[in-house]
């Protein structure tokens, strides 16, 4: 499996004190998504991993939707830092 060199946006101190925040969860899901994507490039017929990827994508999308409704500025900063696209449904 190819390791993805994605540096975390949130520092180690913030992880320890605020591990349940929406931003931390989105960063965590983004790391998992990138890792699974690189895995699926090598193993195209791994359907169980494809299903897991779709589930994680849905969870991240729901969290981003929640964050955009609650605090638009934090949402914009987070998607810019993670270099992910903005949702079309907003």
UniProtKB/Swiss-Prot annotation:
GO terms for cellular component: chloroplast; ribonucleoprotein complex; ribosome. Keywords: Chloroplast, Plastid, Ribonucleoprotein, Ribosomal protein. It holds the Pfam family Ribosomal_S15. Residues 1-20 are annotated as: Disordered. Residues 1-11 have a biased composition (Polar residues). It comes from the Eukaryota. PANTHER family: RIBOSOMAL PROTEIN S15, BACTERIAL AND ORGANELLAR (PTHR23321), SMALL RIBOSOMAL SUBUNIT PROTEIN US15M (PTHR23321:SF26). Belongs to the universal ribosomal protein uS15 family. This is Small ribosomal subunit protein uS15c. It comes from Cucumis sativus (Cucumber). The gene is rps15.
């Amino acid at each position: 499996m190819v390791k993805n060199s994605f540096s975390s946006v949130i520092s180690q101190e913030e992880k320890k004190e605020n591990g349940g925040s929406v931003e931390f969860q989105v960063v965590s899901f983004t790391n998992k998504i990138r890792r699974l994507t690189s895995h699926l490039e090598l193993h195209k017929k791994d359907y169980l991993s494809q299903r897991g990827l779709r589930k994680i994508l849905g969870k991240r999308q729901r969290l981003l939707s929640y964050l955009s409704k609650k605090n638009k500025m934090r949402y914009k900063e987070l998607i810019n830092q993670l270099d992910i696209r903005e949702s079309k449904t907003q």
